[in-house]
Each structure stands twice: as structure tokens, then as C-alpha cells.
Regions:
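Helix-loop-helix junctions within the multi-pass membrane cores of secondary transporters/permeases
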Residues: 1-34, 54, 75-150, 290-391
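Helix-loop-helix hairpins and the membrane-proximal interhelical loops
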Residues: 1-47, 173-175, 209-307, 451-453, ...
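Residue-level signature of catalytic and energy-coupling elements of molecular machines
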Residues: 17, 37, 134, 203, ...
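Hydrophobic/aromatic residues within the transmembrane alpha-helices of Major Facilitator Superfamily
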Residues: 21-28, 57-60, 64, 159, ...
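Membrane-interface helix caps of multi-pass small-molecule transporters
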Residues: 36, 60, 64, 85, ...
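Loop-to-helix transition at the N-terminal end of transmembrane alpha-helices
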Residues: 42-60
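Juxtamembrane transmembrane-helix boundary signature
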Residues: 54-76
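Membrane-embedded alpha-helical modules
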Residues: 90, 104-214, 349-463
Length: 463
């Protein structure tokens, strides 16, 4: 095992395997949540297989090439943007006007095409080390606001999935009924996860999902949870446990739509830019955070071999799109494995092996109901929202307003891209009108004019 330089990193095989297993337990919920979210617009089984394969291969590359204990999978928030904001939302305006419910039939294919191109662009940016420069050009308060906003957005989606928050014609949204078993079970699930996390139980999120699901099975058996497929209430009891079913993969793999993308290039570019920036913040922040916790940063606070790390993330994104899943990114849950002593790529390789093994249990993961995965979304959202505490509210409001707008607009507009646009544009405008235009970096000016052009196109109905 000298390949991983275990002695140099003061670790051993046993520790690395335990760490890799812990990381998997901490992030395995994505195998239930990603098919649940993307399954609203794609083949659910295909998404599951694509997620497991892309996660395994990307994590293997990270471990074998970069030799870092960082695992990758489909990013939360990015998958929600993929399914709800773009597929169901933004692309609807380009459907057939004669259709009472206009939409683009191949919306998810267009999104996969955008994710694939995003990965290629990231590869190019990684080669020329542009990604690091882009991140350094974005204000810290804005980064924190974006992360926190994604957290609120993810939590909101979770609450919708559990019927905690429902549509209301008078107030737009309202509180669901406590007579609904899904709502009650989801709240119990949140409590379970928090209690486990409080006691530092590794895999608290996964255990929370499984226990909530188990309670749902009991609820169905005793007749409290009523199955009603016509109203979207399905059985939570799987018909089998083991199955190497790859049939759904043919419904998702290599399903690109370059025709529409080229015919509507301005809109396609706008989608790519949104994916680019959201993925950029998530990846770099996660990588630095995990590296710092694992004491992998050098004396200058920089990450050695940052190139292979960021390139792996880019390769994973394009690979995931080819297989049929949303943006692949580094997972902050990798810190769970680091906390168990993981220091090398052997930790990542172990996690990758677990993702491959998970392929045999697809019926189990696909039977997990939304009310069982909702607690995970709500809890992970809380972890992300903590970034707002890093914003300097007591200092100059000109430094904080942009981050605040990003933070608040994401859930209210139900769009990550809109939140980023409001945040970045607000930051630049406030700086200019408070006489601090010199604080605006070249990167921020470029982004400002990109979003300004996008707004102009919407107003003039040019795109």
C-alpha cells in the first residue's frame, strides 16, 4: 500500500478502510435522494445506476490520482436546479404555445448536455488554473451567502417533499396537515438525525433515512399510511431486495440534445453559466474545507496537487452527464471519513467500492419515499445555512447586502441561478454607488455584465 503513502501520512490500511466506509455511510443518502429529485423528469432506475457508477468512478479517480480522502457524487442543490428550476421551470417557456401545458419534451436531455459541456469547460479551466483565479475574485461574503441560500433552497424542497410546506392559494405557501403521516414521519426523521448527529454517530443522515423509512413501512402495515398511486402516494415496501437492474441506464445514458442547444444558444449558455458558478463555489469550498480538516494544506494555506483534485471533479461532471445524472461534485461529507482518520486516497477508493456494491440493492434505494429523504434535505440544508454566520453583518452593509440577496432570493424565487444573479449584481451596484468601485474585481465585472445581458434579453424578449 506504499502507492498511497500511508506511513508518510501517519495512517494504516484498517484506518483508511474504516474512514472510507464512514464517508459512504455519511453520503449514501444521495443514492435515495438523487433518483427521487431527478426522477421527476427522468427514469428513476437509470438515475440511480448513473449516480452509483459516476460516484464510484469519480471517487476512484480522486483516490488513485490525487491521493486525497475526498469522495464525489451528484451535488445536492445542483440536482434540484437541474430538475425543478431548468427542466420544469425555465425550459417550459420554449414549448409549443398551442399546448395548454407547454414544455420542452427533451428538457432533461438539454440539461444533461449543459452539464456535459460544463464539465468540458471545467477541464479547460483546470488546465489553465482559471478556476482558482475565479474563486479568488469573488467576495467572501457573497460566497457565504450563496452557500447559505442553497441550504435554504434544499431544505425548502425537503419540506415540500414531506408535505410540511404545501401550496396555498391565499398565502402562496402554507403548513401541511398533521393528519398526514408523511408530515409526521418526516418531522420524526429530522429529530432522529439531529439526535444521532449530537451524539457524533457516523452516518447519522443515512440512519435517519432508514429509520424513518422503517417507521413508514410499519405505518403502511398497520393501515395509517394509505397507498394511493392515483394521488402520488406509493407503497414504501420494496417488492425485492437484490437486483442488478441496469435496464434504466439505457433511458438516461448518452441522451444529449445538441440540436435544441445550438438552436437556442443564448438560453443554453445561460444554463451552462448557472451550472458553472454553482458547481464552482461548491467544489472549491468543499475541497479546501476537507483538506484543512485533514491537515493537507501547506504552510501557505494552499492545497498541494490542487490540479488533479479540480480536474477529477470536472471529469466526474462530464462522466455523470454521459451516464445520466446531474453535476458530480466533491462532498462535504468526506469530512466524516477524515474525522475517522482518513488521510489518503485509500479512503476514497474504499468509498468508491461501496458505491459499486450499492448497485445490487437498487430496489431498496428506489423504494425509499420522499418523506424519508426529506429529513436529510432539511438537515443538510441546516449545515449549509451555517455559512451565513460567517458573513460580517456588523461591518459595512455594502459588503453584506450582496450575500444577503443571494441567500434570501434562492428559496423565494425557487431558483439558485436567480439568487446568484441578484447577489452578484447587488454587490457590484452597491459598491459603485457607495464610492467603492475599486473593490469590484475583473471577475465580478465580467459576471455582472453577463447577468445584465441576461436581464436585458428577458425584458426585450430577445432570447
Amino acid at each position: 500500500m506504499d502507492f498511497f503513502k500511508l506511513k508518510e501520512h501517519d495512517t494504516n490500511v484498517r484506518t483508511e478502510i474504516i474512514a472510507g466506509t464512514t464517508t459512504f455511510l455519511a453520503m449514501a443518502y444521495i443514492l435515495a435522494i438523487n433518483p427521487s429529485i431527478l426522477g421527476t423528469v427522468m427514469n428513476e432506475n437509470g438515475v440511480f445506476v448513473a449516480t452509483a457508477l459516476a460516484s464510484a468512478i469519480s471517487t476512484f479517480i480522486m483516490g488513485l490520482w490525487a491521493n486525497y480522502p475526498i469522495a464525489l457524487s451528484a451535488g445536492l442543490g445542483l440536482n434540484a436546479y437541474f430538475a425543478f428550476t431548468v427542466c420544469i421551470g425555465e425550459l417550459n417557456q420554449f414549448g409549443d404555445p398551442a399546448n395548454p401545458n407547454p414544455s420542452v419534451p427533451n428538457a432533461w436531455m438539454i440539461c444533461l448536455t449543459a452539464v456535459f459541456v460544463e464539465g468540458i469547460i471545467f477541464m479547460i479551466l483546470s488546465i489553465f488554473k482559471v478556476r482558482e483565479k475565479l474563486v479568488n475574485g469573488i467576495p467572501v461574503n457573497l460566497k457565504h451567502g450563496i452557500t447559505a441560500g442553497i441550504g435554504l433552497f434544499v431544505a425548502f424542497i425537503g419540506m415540500q417533499g414531506a408535505n410540511i410546506i404545501i401550496a396555498d392559494s391565499s398565502t402562496i405557501v402554507g403548513l401541511g396537515s398533521f393528519k398526514d403521516p408523511a408530515l409526521v414521519l418526516a418531522i420524526v426523521g429530522v429529530i432522529i438525525i439531529v439526535v444521532f448527529a449530537h451524539h457524533h454517530v457516523k452516518g447519522a443522515v443515512l440512519y435517519g433515512i432508514l429509520i424513518t423509512w422503517g417507521l413508514g413501512i410499519i405505518a403502511e402495515k398497520i393501515g395509517w399510511y394509505h397507498v394511493d398511486p392515483a394521488n402520488g402516494v406509493f407503497s414504501v415496501i420494496p417488492d425485492k431486495v437484490l437486483s442488478l437492474d441496469f435496464s434504466g441506464l439505457k433511458e438516461t445514458a448518452f441522451h444529449f440534445d445538441f440540436g435544441w442547444s445550438l438552436a437556442h444558444l443564448p438560453q443554453f449558455i445561460a444554463i451552462i453559466v448557472s451550472f458553472l458558478y454553482v458547481d464552482l463555489f461548491d467544489t472549491v469550498g468543499t475541497v479546501v474545507g476537507v483538506a484543512e480538516k485533514a491537515n493537507l494544506l501547506d504552510e501557505n494555506g494552499e492545497l498541494p496537487k490542487a490540479g488533479p483534485v479540480l480536474m477529477t471533479d470536472a471529469i466526474g461532471t462530464s462522466l455523470g452527464a454521459c451516464l445520466g445524472t446531474s453535476t458530480i461534485t466533491s462532498f462535504v461529507e468526506s469530512t466524516a471519513g477524515v474525522a475517522e482518520g482518513g488521510r489518503t486516497g485509500l479512503t476514497a477508493v474504499t468509498t468508491g467500492c461501496w458505491f459499486l456494491l450499492a448497485l445490487a440493492f437498487s430496489p431498496l434505494f428506489l423504494a425509499i419515499p420522499s418523506f424519508a429523504t426529506a429529513p436529510a434535505l432539511i438537515y443538510v440544508g441546516m449545515l449549509m445555512v451555517q455559512s451565513v454566520t460567517k458573513m460580517s453583518f456588523e461591518d459595512d452593509p455594502a459588503d453584506t447586502m450582496g450575500g444577503y440577496m443571494a441567500f434570501i432570493m434562492m428559496p423565494l424565487s425557487y431558483s439558485i441561478a436567480t439568487g446568484i444573479m441578484f447577489g452578484m449584481m447587488t454587490w457590484v451596484i452597491v459598491k459603485v454607488f457607495t464610492g467603492k468601485a475599486k473593490d469590484v474585481s475583473v471577475v465580478m465585472w465580467v459576471v455582472f455584465f453577463i447577468f445584465l445581458a441576461r436581464i436585458a434579453s428577458i425584458v426585450t424578449n430577445f432570447f
